[in-house]
Amino acid sequence: KSFAQLRIPLKPDFWLPILGDTSIFSNEENSADYKEFVKGFVLRSSPDDSSIAGLNLSNNSPLNITVYYTNLTGNVQDSYLIDIGAIRSSEFMHDYSNTPVGDVLGQVNTDFAYIQSMQGVNLSVDLSSVKTLENTIVNKAQLEFFLLEETDPLVDPVAGLDVLFINENGTSTQILDSSLSNTSADYLGGSLESTVVGGQTLRKYELDISNHVILIARGEIENPIISIEARNKPQRATRSIVLGQSHPDFPMRLKLVTSKP
């Protein structure tokens, strides 16, 4: 049985001298010298804009990189196998030049914002205003924003969200409401859900960040910036365009239920 393969020609002017070097390529397969010389391979698509290649990296498929060549008679010579093994990782690099996403990167109070999975962008929200609630009881704090419905979306919208912040040690960590959701009831929420507003059926995200807002208001957390990202971000390609703080009809908002002590 022949398994699915991706065959990529190597440049002869670079590889022929190497293949003939017995200090690198010995007669033994899986030469240790070869593995020391060749640390790995980088695959890039051409053209590099709007291109993606998909590889099955499950443990149920044979995952090997093999370098082989033929002699003058056409016979395949010794192949040198690289077993990818059970631990794998992927890195995605995005070029946002001349894109709607690139136009709003680093901007505040925009009409639209973007959340992507994989190596895509997150949404940053500044909660500095809640520091004025120092002497106020915060009963509930919810961040609400609506999804822009695309006519012909390339990928599905993000199904669920997580919220993180940079702590005093400089480490990105889940807010308390997120970590509580991991151990018991779903405190955070963050799933995409339908709602009717003014006769229109819309889809929105609602994040209960009450505990985190209280900690900022008390001064127990100094950094007021939170990062909203796709839940299980590395697992599948998703993207959501959401209505931002400056959207004229359905702006992003922080809903607070408070009382005086």
What are these regions (language model features)?
Residues K1-P261:
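Secreted, disulfide-rich extracellular signaling modules
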